[in-house]
Amino acid sequence: MSESLRIIFAGTPDFAARHLDALLSSGHNVVGVFTQPDRPAGRGKKLMPSPVKVLAEEKGLPVFQPVSLRPQENQQLVADLQADVMVVVAYGLILPKAVLEMPRLGCINVHGSLLPRWRGAAPIQRSLWTGDAETGVTIMQMDVGLDTGDMLYKLSCPITAEDTSGTLYDKLAELGPQGLITTLKQLADGTAKPEVQDETLVTYAEKLSKEEARIDWSLSAAQLERCIRAFNPWPMSWLEIEGQPVKVWKASVIDTATNAAPGTILEANKQGIQVATGDGILNLLSLQPAGKKAMSAQDLLNSRREWFVPGNRLV
């Protein structure tokens, strides 16, 4: 039975904590938890524990917070737990080869894409921005490469026209634990069937940057609408008006041709702020000026109509 496996869990954010909670709720034997060191957060820069640490301590589990797993003494922490398998979910530290080989069944990882598509740091955002029809989770056997290990189990879900990175994150946080528990059962009873990744199908999901989230009006309206959803809730798509950053929370595509230069404001009314793009028109529906809450285009126009005069260009 997979419940009898001695499991080390390694993870840090809320996404990982949801997986740990599922393991504990289903009766699995978690013998130790690794998570990143407490970090300064908030205006007071007070040291804050990770969501995984908070949950582990609530459940009375041993918690380890090494800065790195490269030092021999930190690797010994793993060895001393005599685990059958190590489950890694958004841990944030590199596992050296020696650590990968310590558990009897190795280390397995929950990755937020259908590998080999979107290896890397931002698979949820990249799948949305590119316009993929579906995404999912892959449970894989870890090796020394970046998301290169053999695939053990996959679960998929559609990407809807309303999905943001936030909603997809929640969907995958539901799928991941299901796939993880199934995979552990298969590993325990010897029925797991590792599948080698097809290197010809590999794509990479590079880490996001705030500068990358700045709206580039030369792109098509369809691309920009996906970008806005992909970067919600972080780092948030934004544009600049009078030297001020304005975040864009929601937009829609108006499938009408225009000869206006990209970035030209075409209309600004209660239906939205309509802007020419490289192909089509983007209708801005919800925006957030610096220091303010998100608001409808209509509410922003009531206070800042001078920002959106038809004929002016956004850069």
Swiss-Prot record:
Catalytic activity: L-methionyl-tRNA(fMet) + (6R)-10-formyltetrahydrofolate = N-formyl-L-methionyl-tRNA(fMet) + (6S)-5,6,7,8-tetrahydrofolate + H(+)
GO MF term list: methionyl-tRNA formyltransferase activity
Cellular component, GO annotation: cytosol
Highest rank taxon of the organism: Bacteria
Short name of one Pfam family: Formyl_trans_N
EC number: 2.1.2.9
Top enzyme class: transferase
Sorted UniProt keywords: Protein biosynthesis, Transferase
Family annotation (PROSITE patterns): GART (PS00373)
Keyword Protein biosynthesis among UniProt keywords: yes
Binding site for (6S)-5,6,7,8-tetrahydrofolate: S113, L114, L115, P116
InterPro entries xref list: Fmt, Formyl_trans_C, Formyl_trans_C_sf, Formyl_transf_N, Formyl_transf_N_sf, Formyl_transferase-like_C_sf, GART_AS, Met-tRNA-FMT_C
Family assignment from sequence similarity: Belongs to the Fmt family.
Protein name in the entry: Methionyl-tRNA formyltransferase
Native source organism of the sequence: Escherichia coli O7:K1 (strain IAI39 / ExPEC)
